[in-house]
Amino acid sequence: MLRHLQTTKMLCNYSSMSSGIILNEKELRDTRLRVSRLTDSLSSESSVKQMTSGLPAEVVVQVTEMMKAERKNLLASIEAYESAKETGNAMLLQQRASSDPGVTLIVARIAKGYSQRDLAWRLGIKEQQIQRYEADRYNSISLKNYARVAALLCVQIRATIQENPEFRGLDAIIADVSKEDIKKILRHGRTRGWFSEEMNEAQLRQYIAENRIEFGSPSLLRTGLNVSDHSEDVLLHAWRARLAARARAEISKELPGFDPLDIGWLPDLVRLTVHDDGPKRAIRMLAEHGIIVIVEAQIPGLAIDGAAFLEQGTPVIGLTIRKDTLDNFWFTLLHELAHVILHYRTGLSTGFYDQDEAVSSDEQEAEADKFAGNLLIPGERWARSTARIANSPEVIEKFAKDLGIHSAIVFGRIRKERNNYTIFANKIGGNSVRAQLMEQS
């Protein structure tokens, strides 16, 4: 099948909303409507205020920049599609298709001025068959029929032999996986119910190899505070595969669609922090807005706090609850949510994998930190607050109450800013998150 020829990616996203490419008239109409909505929202200060009501000024600035970038990208998508359709120049559209062989056929059809009906007639098949092929980007077509369509559209197929593990046999793909890591994943997976007790080392090696083929190797492990290379981290592969499998099960339940411009509910999310079961309520609220949150314990040695990526076009946030404290939970959740909202088109398809420790050297991670920090504690309020320098728990707790957030969040912020994790250790909501969320795992 054609899927074995495709450039492997961490996710295959087929929606025009997140892929940034328009391939038919319906997607063109939808994109134009979205541009119109963005233009209206950005047309005046009052329009922006209405859309971002209740959000801190610092967050409003970030959201506004995201909207401007979104509008610019959508206009470029429209230009690429119309240029291919009206002039036959498919260069811009092909650039957006990248090396995806299925999308390349659709681009070629558009550039030749063929409708789906025209192509079906030339192939001697029903129009509905072309519609099905294009709906899944030709994933379901046989190699023989792919070659037939490609020939009709004057698309050349080339085979290149290169030293790339994604094009080698399964044994070569997982040759670097140690027995120790295999045993570690087996122990963890059996304990957590990832797979049955009957799975052996050989089967797990095949599972890991197939996962690398399906998702590819992430070129970077993006951390909340720095960027480090984890392109061959087998523990990350295994954990990510588990998240993706659980996310697909949730997607099958037909959740509401996600809209990065729908942000009016964010203040309500922050207000949930004051509740004892706030983490559980937060996960339900995100699901109501088309964002899946999966709580899955990390494999020992991985040291991951959270992740954000797309699965079948749906945003997924993964949390490990590596540190069982309320302050860490809320900051990690909102950091990943920042990636979903701010970076929906500019990184989420590759994915973000976050650790809470060290110093950020990545622009998108710094943006996510800023978004999460200001959403929880508005920068202007924090700069004027005596709680920043207070040693009295009462002063800090009063500030949190005035803000309408859990005091653990403020105590955690102080510990981090002062780089002193010995203070207020009993004030950050320890041992209160796993108990209510790990039952999901």
Please identify what each model-predicted range represents.
Residues 103-120, 249-250:
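Short basic helix-loop element that most often maps to the first helix and adjoining turn
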Residues 2-98:
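N-terminal flexible/basic segments that precede or flank functional cores
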Residues 113-133:
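Short alpha-helical DNA-recognition segment
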Residues 166-441:
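Active-site hotspot residues in diverse enzymes, especially metal/ion-binding acidic/histidine motifs
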Residues 105, 116, 127, 146, ...:
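Helix-turn-helix DNA-binding elements, focusing on the entry/boundary residues of the two helices
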Residues 143-159:
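DNA major-groove recognition helix of helix-turn-helix/homeodomain DNA-binding modules
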